[in-house]
Amino acid sequence: MSSIPRLLLGALLLFPLALLAQGKKRTDQPLEMARLPAVPTLPDAFPQVVGTQVFGPAYKFTKDEAVFEAAKGISAMGSRILKINAVSGQQLTPYVAMPFTHYVLWYRSSNEWTKGFTPELRRREYNAVYLFTKDLLTRYDTAGKTFFLGHWEGDWYLLPDKDVKKDASPELTAAMIEWLNVRQKAVEDARSEVPYAKCRVYTYAEVNRVRDAMKDGRKRVVNAVLPKVNVDFVSYSAYDSQLLPVEEVRATLDYVNAQLPAKPGLPAKRVFVGECGLSWKACGADGAKHEQRNREILAKLLTWKPAMVLFWQYYNNEVVDGEQVGFWLVDNKNNKTPLHATLTELFAAQEEAAKEMRARTRRLPGYEEIAAFSENWLNARAPR
């Protein structure tokens, strides 16, 4: 694997003792961010980049709660990344005990604010996010881990009837801007009050109708909300571009990233892929085709070198007319798909590559190096 200089995001995800830009003021950037404390490094931890998630699974096979059962399965694959819905710090405790290094969390991902973001709702939102963040920052069991707090596909909040020929209304757009900024302030206030924190907590907003804005000029989260908020990162639910040529995929990610105001202490590239993938049904219930097409999608998205690319998902959540749609790595009969095997082998290959790099260079790979390695590895795989 070639030696690529680690960029700032790689440093963030690997938890260095200090951010490269920490303590330095950038006069060209008007936005300010609370200084982040130094945190310890987890032994042998590196940004794995590729991962999966579990939301609303339609089945399970043990006495465990369905999401927890799936999280165990994801960990058994060798994954270091987990994306789930979070309700409270207490609910997260068994997940934090697992050997994941990065947690992408839907937290308070509801549409209550779309009905009018009243002072009382603002107060409740701020308090909940502040207390949740402070809990993560002060717990002993979160040491060395990174948490991203965000929400489900933001454009559906702005288009409640899912009519993509419409623009988002000014009222909903303004409410979303305020909602995201309240959440950001809560996280930054909590971060500033815990100088001894042993983990990282960031915010993200999720966009999902990017091409509407990019190609048709429609008002969407990406162009109407992102330029006016102060979120740390952006998640892109990439279904509207994942089947396009690789040049268009990269251009779309560039477009999303360009809408973000720069932030001191954070890298220039702050977009990750929060959802992608084709269902079993969309691939004709053919395991080999499902593996190949999704492997190609993952490799294509990795060419942009995002910090994460997350496949949707481990257990299927969609059932139509009694039939499983098949957004899965493990089906409703507890059969592991060929794609499950591919990702499990990828995670093992990443571990070996990281060990080799550490032995050779005395450092672990950064996110861009792992993204490049994973892209090449996936492209080199023979069809199953």
Describe each model-derived feature in a short phrase.
Residues N111-W113, L158-D163, K263-N294, F311-V330:
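Active-site clefts of carbohydrate-active enzymes
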Residues E32-P43, P47, G51, G56, ...:
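Aromatic-rich peripheral "rim/lid" segments of glycoside hydrolase catalytic domains that contact
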Residues L136-P170, K198-V207:
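Active-site groove signature of glycoside hydrolases
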Residues G150-H151, I177-R218, L266-G277, M308-Y314:
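Aromatic-lined carbohydrate-recognition surfaces of secreted/lumenal glycan-active proteins
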Residues P43-D44, A71-A76, Q91-Y103, L136-A143, ...:
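Acidic (Asp/Glu)-rich catalytic clusters
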Residues V50, K60-W106, V309:
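Catalytic domains of carbohydrate-active enzymes, especially glycoside hydrolases
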Residues A224, K228-G284:
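Glycoside hydrolase catalytic-domain groove-lining segments
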Residues K60-S75, A213-V225, H290-K300:
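Short, acidic/polar
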